[in-house]
Amino acid sequence: MGLDGNNGGGVWLNGGGGEREENEEGSWGRNQEDGSSQFKPMLEGDWFSSNQPHPQDLQMLQNQPDFRYFGGFPFNPNDNLLLQHSIDSSSSCSPSQAFSLDPSQQNQFLSTNNNKGCLLNVPSSANPFDNAFEFGSESGFLNQIHAPISMGFGSLTQLGNRDLSSVPDFLSARSLLAPESNNNNTMLCGGFTAPLELEGFGSPANGGFVGNRAKVLKPLEVLASSGAQPTLFQKRAAMRQSSGSKMGNSESSGMRRFSDDGDMDETGIEVSGLNYESDEINESGKAAESVQIGGGGKGKKKGMPAKNLMAERRRRKKLNDRLYMLRSVVPKISKMDRASILGDAIDYLKELLQRINDLHNELESTPPGSLPPTSSSFHPLTPTPQTLSCRVKEELCPSSLPSPKGQQARVEVRLREGRAVNIHMFCGRRPGLLLATMKALDNLGLDVQQAVISCFNGFALDVFRAEQCQEGQEILPDQIKAVLFDTAGYAGMI
């Protein structure tokens, strides 16, 4: 099997000898040079550039029992057996009898070969796509050849034109023959691929046979009529439009409102158009989106909150603080929620008003002579100036409590490192003794840093550290004792 590209047309032919069949039944791992040599004529320009095939190719085609693929079409309709319609067909598996061939004519040029491989010289047992290139065994495949290739041609002489885009009937089927692909390949019949731009058929920009890009029809964007129901493709197109518009308008639809519970309701987006549940068109007949304020789900947006949101938060915090203060004042609180706190506070105020009214009624019912004196019954919490003066006089007068019996005044003075001293003094308590003692120590030039004073059951003074502040004059312990005894009222006790 090979491609004869020396002449005007390209013909896939099967050799007559058994050696050619043995080569076709070889394994998939055959040398790549053998496989590429068979495809080399396909890449040359003479394979498809000629308008008419060579007469030798037509003679070889008629003599060969096995037909693979014919690259060019002859001008004579009698010689082109692929484009002839059969008058009668007995095949029951063909979907359309109008495009099937007569069984007697099929055996003349399309024979079934199950043992031969496809264009790549692959055995039928190892190539799962072998049936895609066997034209003679499937009558249904002949319909696929007729449908895209011979569809819309007024006469077979139009196939000689290099630019098939000028044929008006061919424009409707051009998108089916050249679908858009990422690898710039176009699927022909039976899974066979050809480059997008072929010599002689024009470039993609010029609207050639194979190189022209498929014009994507957009019937999905147009809504159906009012009486008809939308198709599945129109539904999917509307869903894509609605999803894209939702993403585009997500930033602009930020309207909010506040509820009583502090939740924030955002703008809900609802697309009106095709009703996918009941397969009916909406009454408005518009496929655009409509924004409904106050609907949709609840949520919170990221970013800085609005000013009114911050003010609302401050107001709620202040209200909660006042409620907590009211709850602390009201003695009887049944529950801790806001309604219970306010209800209990109202009940407590009513109870207080009732007690005030009862006291007023009691005062009015009692006679004036039977009232007790106010001086004995009223004891204010804060002392008046008269009571303060009485207390000061009592403090200044000698104490009625005498000193403990058998105890005499005692004063001890000890020197410490440096110029510091320790003083321990105990004597009977009398008014003004503490003030007189501190003045005496100050006159001696001693700075008291740490001291403990007790006036319970006598007067006790413990100075743990007192330093001499005057330089050049050192005070002896005996001098300190004499001054303290004299201050306590025990002169000459040393």
From Swiss-Prot:
Main location: nucleus
Gene label: SCRM
Taxon lineage: Eukaryota, Viridiplantae, Streptophyta, Embryophyta, Tracheophyta
Chain residue numbers at which the record places covalent cross-link Glycyl lysine isopeptide (Lys-Gly) (interchain with G-Cter in SUMO): K393
Domain bHLH: 303-352
Organism in which the protein naturally occurs: Arabidopsis thaliana
Any one Gene Ontology cellular component term annotated for this protein: nucleus
Coiled coil residues, start to end: 344-365
Assembly mode: Homodimer. Efficient DNA binding requires dimerization with another bHLH protein. Interacts with the C-terminal part of HOS1. Heterodimers with SPCH, MUTE, and FAMA.
Gene Ontology biological-process entries: abscisic acid-activated signaling pathway; endosperm development; negative regulation of DNA-templated transcription; positive regulation of DNA-templated transcription; regulation of abscisic acid biosynthetic process; response to cold; response to freezing; seed dormancy process
Gene3D superfamilies, per the entry: Helix-loop-helix DNA-binding domain
Compositionally biased region (Low complexity): 242-253, 364-377
SUPFAM superfamilies hit by this protein: HLH, helix-loop-helix DNA-binding domain (SSF47459)
Name the record gives this protein: Transcription factor ICE1
